[in-house]
Swiss-Prot record:
One of its GO terms (cellular component) is membrane. The gene is easM. InterPro entries: Cyt_P450, Cyt_P450_CS, Cyt_P450_E_grp-IV, Cyt_P450_sf. It is found in: Membrane. This is Cytochrome P450 monooxygenase easM. Disruption phenotype: Blocks the ergot alkaloid pathway at festuclavine, and downstream products are eliminated. Pathway: Alkaloid biosynthesis; ergot alkaloid biosynthesis. Its main location: membrane. Induction: The expression of the ergot alkaloid synthesis cluster which leads to the synthesis of fumigaclavines is positively regulated by the brlA and stuA transcription factors. It is a single-pass membrane protein. Ergot alkaloids are known for their toxic effects on humans who consume contaminated grains or livestock that graze on grasses harboring ergot alkaloid-producing fungi. Due to their strong affinity for monoamine neurotransmitter receptors they may also have clinical uses such as treatment of migraines, Parkinson's disease and cerebrovascular insufficiency. Glycans are attached at N50, N353. Its EC number is 1.-.-.-.
Length: 519
């Protein structure tokens, strides 16, 4: 069954509905009370384009329309208004025209983690993975910044050493055409490389750990999607019955059971070393980075390190998959990328950051894929911690969830033929005055929000760029690849999520030409 159909099917699932029916009846009066206690408020200053009340979420038609056509709703809204409200799966959201991007991007009254708390239910059992940081703590953000800088120093060599072996295993050495599933193979590569970067020697090769944490992340996102389909007042009940939530609680327990003994053993080892006047060994992994970043502050030592690999696994997998699918229809661009790789001529001991920075065309092609297909259709989502007045006098009330739609990334005033893929686009734009440093993959701007923009821009984007470039170098240099036929790849839109095609197949074959530094 199609992924989107499965999501919508939750609304009428035979597995869930009977168990919830009795409980739903028992709280029906609460819904009526809620409408009395929480009438339309100051939020109604902006028009709502797909409903008039938050409790309209109980209307399946409104919710289904948002899940299947959020972009269409926003496009219609922007044709009429600069600011409007939309009933989303996390409640009412205020959508700002992209022209407001620069005005809000560094505003510290606007908080991202508070939005994450609304989207990912961190206080429900099993959703422990998404809890860190939603309480106002900055341990996670500090750990990501510290860990990313550590990874950049060691990642190029490590990734270079491993990528060739992984591709040989997953794509083979056959000179004849054969088929692979693009996203699943990319997922396996990113999962393995992330484990090497983020987990210590005890866990990076632990089969059960890798399987459980991978499933935990996938089920966590699925469970959150399912819960968002229920009216807010029913979610505390629904989470006990939904199959994905039940599975998530088991996976959370199993994850803790695997990582907590490792943490305990390290703490014991440190205590013994200190008692004998010795310095304990230093582990260069996410467990250690988070502990050092915390500086004595409380945090979830078992779950916080997982967020390094979870973010890398899902967002980087999606980006690299989309890049490969886009390139598979651009044979001339693939040839040009091979020539660029050869011109850089990495040393025999692998790629370095300096050589990766010379791959201007590759950088441009990746950024172009991200421009046309970011991970979400509403970016820079923020929660207003206080009342906010915009420069034009519009007032954003405290408690508003707001966001910027992606349409600015197809602005014809910035981009020529904005709906067309042009792998050379950002390489050429570097020559324009004022754009020299704004067209790199890791650069953020009001007209490219792929990694966000401002104080909440993705702190892991520098490491993600290194990962994608190294893997892509090996794929482009060592393999011919093209779409395997059938229907062209389609982006799946589920609410605000934009998901690269999970089923797209590639025809691949090993090239025989030797590439300097890649053999």
């Amino acid at each position: 069954m199609d992924f989107l159909q499965r999501i919508l099917g939750i609304l009428s699932s035979e597995d869930v509905a009977p168990a919830l029916f009795a409980s739903s009846i028992s709280v029906l009066f609460l819904i009526l009370s809620y409408q009395v206690l929480y009438p339309p408020s100051k939020y109604s200053a902006f028009p709502t384009i797909n409903g008039t009340r938050w409790l309209a979420l109980s209307n399946r038609r409104i919710l289904a329309e948002f899940v299947t056509d959020a972009q269409g709703l926003m496009r219609n809204g922007l044709e009429k208004y600069d600011i409007f409200r939309i009933i989303s799966s996390i409640g009412p959201m205020t959508i700002l025209h992209p022209k407001y991007t620069d005005e809000i991007h560094n505003d510290r009254q606007l908080n991202f983690m508070a939005v994450l708390a609304k989207e990912m239910f961190p206080n429900y059992p099993g959703f422990d993975l998404f809890r860190e940081g939603t309480d106002g703590s900055t341990v996670l953000q500090d750990a990501v910044k510290f860990g990313s800088s550590r990874c950049l120093g060691k990642s190029t060599q490590l990734l270079s050493d491993e990528t060739s072996t992984l591709l040989q295993k997953l794509w083979g050495d056959e000179p004849e055409w054969h088929e692979v599933t693009a996203k699943s193979s990319v997922h396996d590569i990113i999962a393995h490389l992330s484990a090497l970067l983020f987990y210590g020697p005890e866990l990076c090769s632990h089969k059960e750990w890798l399987e459980v944490t991978d499933e935990y992340a996938s089920v966590g996102f699925l469970a959150a999607r399912q819960l968002r389909l229920w009216p807010p007042i029913l979610r505390p009940i629904a989470q006990w019955f939904l199959p994905a939530c039940r599975r998530l609680r088991y996976l959370a327990s199993r994850t803790r059971g695997l990582i907590e003994p490792v943490i305990a053993a390290r703490q014991k080892e440190k205590a013994i070393c200190y008692s004998h006047g010795r310095q304990p060994p230093v582990y260069d992994d996410a467990i250690e980075w988070t502990e050092r970043a915390a500086k004595g502050r409380p945090y979830d030592a078992a779950m916080s390190p997982l967020l390094f690999s979870i973010n890398a696994l899902h967002t980087t997998t999606d980006l690299l998959t989309q890049v490969i699918l886009d390139l598979s229809t651009q044979p001339d661009l693939i040839v040009a990328l091979r020539q660029e790789i050869l011109s850089v001529k990495p040393q025999q001991n692998g790629w370095k950051n300096a050589s990766l920075n010379q791959l201007l065309l590759m950088d441009s092609a990746i950024k172009e894929s991200q421009r046309l297909k970011p991970t979400e259709s509403i970016l820079m989502r923020r929660y207003a911690m206080d009342d906010l007045t915009l420069a034009d006098g519009n007032k954003i009330p405290k408690g508003t969830v707001l966001g910027i739609p992606i349409f600015g990334m197809r602005d014809p005033k910035i981009y020529v033929d904005p709906d067309m893929y042009d792998g050379y686009r950002f390489q050429k734009m570097r020559d324009k005055p004022g754009f020299e440093n704004k067209c790199q993959l890791v650069s953020t701007s009001p007209w490219h929000l792929g990694f966000g923009h401002g104080i909440h821009a993705c702190p892991g984007r520098f490491l993600a760029a290194v990962q994608v470039k190294i893997i892509l170098c090996y794929i482009v240099a060592k393999y011919d690849f093209k779409l395997a036929g059938g229907a062209p790849p389609k982006v799946q839109s589920v609410g605000i999520e934009l998901i690269s095609d999970t089923e797209a197949r590639l025809a691949v074959r090993r090239r025989q030409e030797m590439v300097i530094g890649l053999e």
